[in-house]
Amino acid sequence: MSPGVEALLEQARSGLQRLTPHETVAAVRGGALLIDTRTERHRREQGDLPGAIVIDRTVLEWRLDPASPWRIPEATGYDREIVVVCRHGYSSSLAAASLQTLGLRRATDMIGGVQGWISAGLPLSEHPADVRP
């Protein structure tokens, strides 16, 4: 019998130094990439985060792997700090663990996702999202 998704999530998080929303703000100010993997519908419902780059979860690894021909220009090296966010902080943990497996050792996610950001009273963006194909 499979150990289940909770065990998978626990294993993924065991290798992450997850950040609070306020720690995420500080990390982004220090140069970390803030990557939003939420769908357009969820971004419309919750709002966009200032400075976030929106990348669809299905292509995340290709866009952030510095060795990939499909990387975004900001994917400059394996030592780049990356903070992944989703709605509630579950799928972002799995995504960050996958990025670490690629060699992006400083990839992590934000505790509580965008809902945690909102609950912490942090501002949402007043500008259109930076959506990358």
Residue ranges and their predicted role:
Residues 1-33, 40-81, 90-133:
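Rhodanese-like catalytic fold shared by cysteine-dependent sulfurtransferases
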Residues 85:
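Short, surface-exposed ligand- or partner-binding patches at beta-edge/loop junctions that are enriched
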